[in-house]
Amino acid sequence: MSAIGVFDSGYGGLTVLKSLMAKLPQHDFIYYGDNGRAPYGERSFEEVYDFTLDATKKLFDLGCPLVILACNTASAKALRTIQQKYLPLYEPNKRVLGVIRPSAEVVGELSKTHHIGLLATEGTVRSNSYKLESVKFSPHIELFELACPKWVPLIEEDLVYS
């Protein structure tokens, strides 16, 4: 059985990896953290896309037929372009998934007040990805997003558990 690739711009995606390992114990995983270029939140679409595509290709080269983008900014800025423009032409038998849609699917079920606060990078907040996805599944919720430029450094320094 092939390994599932998990990509993040740093260490934050290890929480996604831990959850995947618990839910899918029959699979092996390869984690790729791009700590040298983290954080991605303030970077342009082109930079995030290039870095994410590079990591995805490396995980494909390591034999992963599925790559999970555990990075919110990569999911917000690069996922759709990779899915719609790169995969059909170059890797039609491989898949790349992000974390925003699955999070948006369950967020409405978790709130009793229907008011949700989201702390994220500037790039994730500016993309409106969470608002666009969450309204599809839970149109009754009100999402409050706040860009926190210091969030990723706190996670990377292990001062906050994400």
Question: Locations of the language-model features?
Answer:
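Non-catalytic structural scaffold of enzyme domains
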Residues: M1-S162
